[in-house]
Amino acid sequence: MTVQSPDDSTRAPATSTAAPATADPKIKARGVKVFYGDKQALFDVDLDIPAKSVTAFIGPSGCGKSTFLRCINRMNDTIPSARVEGSILIDGADVNAKSVDPVVLRSRVGMVFQKPNPFPKTIFENVAYGPRIHGLATGKAELEAIVESSLKKAGLWNEVADRLHQPGTGLSGGQQQRLVIARAIAVSPEVILMDEPCSALDPIATAKIEELIDELRSQFCIVIVTHSMAQAARVSQRTAFFHLGKLVESGPTEEMFTNPRDSRTQDYITGRFG
């Protein structure tokens, strides 16, 4: 995928050109604002995210992309000064409704962080932990089947099948990140959020994670924050560009990278700022 560089006079004015993704999105955000104390970090975000696809969030550091990502599974609840306004619906249900248990929500919406964070447990127990506490397995055999299936989906089973009872922290960085993805998959989520999942990995491990993301998108709604526009172009079907706490533009990834509608998007993807 190449980046088109139209003359400045042909570019769209600097107004938001974000558009709904589908008529029936998996995730639907409207008027989302985030405050940390008196400081507003996110301004009136409207965004639709489709099911069974990869949506990439791009933008310079501090633009609000990770802040918005954390709204989807209410991770901002863990920050005492944070306040979220607006609505985020998953399959039509507001994640911020008082009746929603954040723990249950986070089993539906898994999260993979920037640095691999396996539990200080065995490889098996890392994956078994979620299904066990959520009562997803009725016995040992079913739990073992979930662990095996999750590790296979994460592309890790063949590498660890003979050492399941060794510490997860003994794996390489790329293997640890795939273990974390297996842990998320094990509780049968509907959405997987990834906050710069490859930033701490070498190119070979990054390529394996990207291959895994491509394989998983047929089963899950995946949202990835990345500073790498090349990665966004490789793994995503839709892209959303954030700048200064605002969603500037969203749309099909190929269109965003070859024919952006907003001048700020064009400037960012061509390296004029960021």
From Swiss-Prot:
Q: What class of enzyme is it?
A: translocase
E.C. number(s) listed in UniProt: 7.3.2.1
* Primary localization class, coarse: membrane
State its location(s).
Cell inner membrane
Pfam families under this entry?
ABC_tran
What is the membrane topology noted in the UniProt record heading this document? Answer: Peripheral membrane protein
User: What quaternary structure, including any partners, is listed in this protein's UniProt entry?
Assistant: The complex is composed of two ATP-binding proteins (PstB), two transmembrane proteins (PstC and PstA) and a solute-binding protein (PstS).
Binding-site positions, ATP: 59-66
InterPro entries cross-referenced by the UniProt entry = AAA+_ATPase, ABC_transporter-like_ATP-bd, ABC_transporter-like_CS, P-loop_NTPase, PstB-like
Q: Which PROSITE patterns match?
A: ABC_TRANSPORTER_1, ABC_TRANSPORTER_2, PSTB
Reactions performed catalytically: phosphate(out) + ATP + H2O = ADP + 2 phosphate(in) + H(+)
Write down the SMART domains for this protein, in alphabetical order.
AAA
* Gene Ontology biological process terms from the UniProt entry: phosphate ion transmembrane transport
- Which GO cellular component does the record give, naming just one? plasma membrane
The UniProt record lists the ABC transporter domain at 27-269
| Region (Disordered) residue spans | 1-23
Q: What is this protein called?
A: Phosphate import ATP-binding protein PstB
- Gene3D superfamilies xrefs: P-loop containing nucleotide triphosphate hydrolases
Q: Does the keyword Transport apply?
A: yes
Q: Which UniProt keywords apply?
A: ATP-binding, Cell inner membrane, Cell membrane, Membrane, Nucleotide-binding, Phosphate transport, Translocase, Transport
The family assignment reads: Belongs to the ABC transporter superfamily. Phosphate importer (TC 3.A.1.7) family.
